[in-house]
Amino acid sequence: AINVQTWQLKLAKQFSPNYVRIVQGMLCLAFDRAIILGLAKKNPARMIGNIKSKKVKIDFWTLEEFQKVIALLYKGDYYEHYLFISFWLLFMTGMRIGEAAALQWDDIDFETGMLIISKTLYYKTMNDYKFVEPKTQASNRTIYIDADTIKELQEWKAVQAKVLPNCGFVLSYNSTPTSKTTLPRALEKLANLAGVHRIKIHALRHSHASLLISMGENPLLIQERLGPEKIQTTLGTSGHL
């Protein structure tokens, strides 16, 4: 048990408490299995216990902060319109950036307001990318999009079609899918201009969860909408609400 505790303390100096807890849990299960197989008599990992979890503060924007940012984008400019719809879609759906980059017009039913999420995009370069199936079945989901989002998407589709008549990607301004650096850089620049705190692109997903929680939505339904995500993470985005 002493050796395991020494290992645990050493690990805690290098990694986050939550990561150490995961590794410790796996070690504990391994010892349990060893006991069943007759390879060990005791479980030292269970004897010393796990370290305390650390609540991670998750960053997000409120609706008001998001509106300040997108208000800086002029939809009369083709590229700015592309940025507008990209950030709008991420904030209003909670999609991961890879899921949004892989989204195609055929995945959206404007009549029913349903959006199908069935793939993600692995992007290496402009000419080297591929669709990847989600790691879990829960990532395959169909979500409802609100009337304003439908309107914004239809407007962007019409504008995009004039420049790129045969483009299948929703978030594209040049016939290729959105790169993994374009949106994060633009988001950081716009945040500075808008005078709001900077967030990572993934935080728009957390912002969507925060918005739904503030509207009184059921946390379990929010989790289903976001796909595989710990419910504690979903709730943690808006612990102040």
What are the roles of these predicted feature ranges?
Residues 14-17, 71-83, 93, 143, ...:
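Short, basic (Lys/Arg/His-rich) helix/loop patches that form interaction surfaces
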Residues 1-39, 55, 76-81, 177-182, ...:
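N-terminal core-binding DNA-recognition domain of tyrosine site-specific recombinases/integrases
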Residues 17, 21, 36-103, 111, ...:
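Basic, Lys/Arg- and aromatic-enriched nucleic-acid-binding interface segment
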